[in-house]
Amino acid sequence: MVNLTAAEKTQVTNLWGKVNVKELGGEALSRLLVVYPWTRRFFEHFGDLSTAEAVLHNAKVLAHGEKVLTSFGEGLKHLDNLKGTFADLSELHCDKLHVDPENFRLLGNVLVIVLARHFGKEFTPDVQAAYEKVVAGVANALAHKYH
């Protein structure tokens, strides 16, 4: 659960309504893999990830980034039950994929940067504060199975 005020919920959903999940999802996952190169080990089956340029243009990375942000957007519809919403993904990432749960926090941080880059002045400090709460809540929900 994320404790957001009514105003924060409105800010989050209003901005999210403008998000192009294909574009921003690809950028967010690509940035994660470039900035934190050790995360690439989870995506070795995606092909060439040897350079930043290769990552940024890898069709499988871009498609998976879209999938990630689509799931994130679904989570925004269930802010009062993030653990339930992400229970299956938490189990998958823990039991099958063995993803370090810290990576969820890192991806959340990258997503905030991508949103700020794309929305500029519209991504005010108040909007950022609301999104920081949301990405922390989603990361916590995804890490739930690990506890």
Swiss-Prot record:
Domain Globin: 3-147
Single GO term (MF): oxygen binding
Disulphide connectivity of cysteines: none
Protein name, as recorded: Hemoglobin subunit delta
Protein source organism: Loxodonta africana (African elephant)
Taxonomy, superkingdom: Eukaryota
SUPFAM superfamilies reported for this sequence: Globin-like
Alphabetized Pfam families for the sequence: Globin (PF00042)
Family that this chain belongs to: Belongs to the globin family.
Quaternary state and interactors: Heterotetramer of two delta chains and two alpha chains.
Chain sites annotated for binding heme b: H64, H93
CDD domains the UniProt entry points to: Hb-beta-like (cd08925)
Gene name as annotated: HBD
GO cellular component, one term: haptoglobin-hemoglobin complex
Keyword Signal belongs to the record: no
